[in-house]
Amino acid sequence: MMVRMKSKIKISGKDAFGWFLICISVLMLCKSLALCFSNDIWYDELFTVGMIEHSYGELIHFTAADVHPPLYYCVTKFFVDLCKLVLPGAGTVIPAKIVSVLPYFVLLLYSVTWIRKRFSIFTGGMFLFCVIAMPQLPAYTVEVRMYGWALLFVTAAFLHAYGCVDRCSRKPYLHGAALVLYGLAAAYTQYFACVAVVMVYFYVLAAFWRQDKRRIKEWCLYVALSIVGYVPWLFALARQISTVRENYWILPLTWRSLGGCVKFLMKPAFTSEPLNVVLAVVMFAGYVEVVGGSLIRYRIGSKRSREIENAGHAEILKEAEKIYHNGRVLHGAAGLAVLVGVVLFGFAASFLIRPVFVYRYMLPAMGCFWLSFAIG
């Protein structure tokens, strides 16, 4: 007589909520796709639409003469031309809007695979929900601009940076290659995305310095490859910097603008202003509690781990303490540091040279910012 053993897959409440957030996020992405089927655009989007009507050579020439790198426009032109090839008579605006939604589907894949395996599906679901639904971000999901792609490239570079520094990673060099490629893609997409990637590289350097100083040579290799990969655009960048130094449209910053950065990150856009203020305060307090609390627990857990190891009982470390010890929480804190670094760079450049920073230039680093919250 054969007895059939029925295996039951147990899903914790936290994981179930993570999958729920994934489903909600997918529904929001589907809604974003539905919103693409409109020809309504504003001035900056009109610039993109006009740019992709040119050949690739002209497009690169015009972006070099302006203040933008060319990758986003090339990607958008390729997709729009492909749509027109498959569907003769198709317009330009709708396919261009769809291009802006595509990066979030890539982040969906990262959430249910890469993030789920290394952190949890709860972390993946919370991250994806945040980068789609948190203040400011929904407005740029379908906008015909480069911010969604810049956010994808910076976030992916940051994720693979964790693969580089994680002691449990089996193929750190593959993650290093992905870091270089995504970093270059970010630098060729938007300049403050390039700044964000520089902050990611500083994080990797700090992690190597802390873990194994011999790996700093590996970090130097990644940096050298990135510089070589960006050489073709350096002359155009130098001309653009010279142009911006002489004249640019951005208004001067004040120290009150730092508060504006927090409002940009946390303040919703409901019709009730008092409600927006209350929600912004609650969200800010929640973010500080989650990220700050995880750092405090890390310090306590790390100290306890060292005491146990010094006593010769490393085998009794709890799994949570191992996770803290392997740098998960520090990686989460580094996500916040990436955004802070972008803001500090923007303010420093604006005060020392001329104003070059507006709040939306934080968008490329906001994936790292909300990943920090999800990890915490």
Please tell me what each predicted stretch does.
Residues 1-14, 316:
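Short, Lys/Arg-rich, polar N-terminal cytosolic tail immediately upstream
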Residues 16, 21-166, 173-376:
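Membrane-proximal helix-loop-helix interfaces that form the catalytic/acceptor-binding platform
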Residues 1-4, 165, 169:
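N-terminal leader/targeting segments
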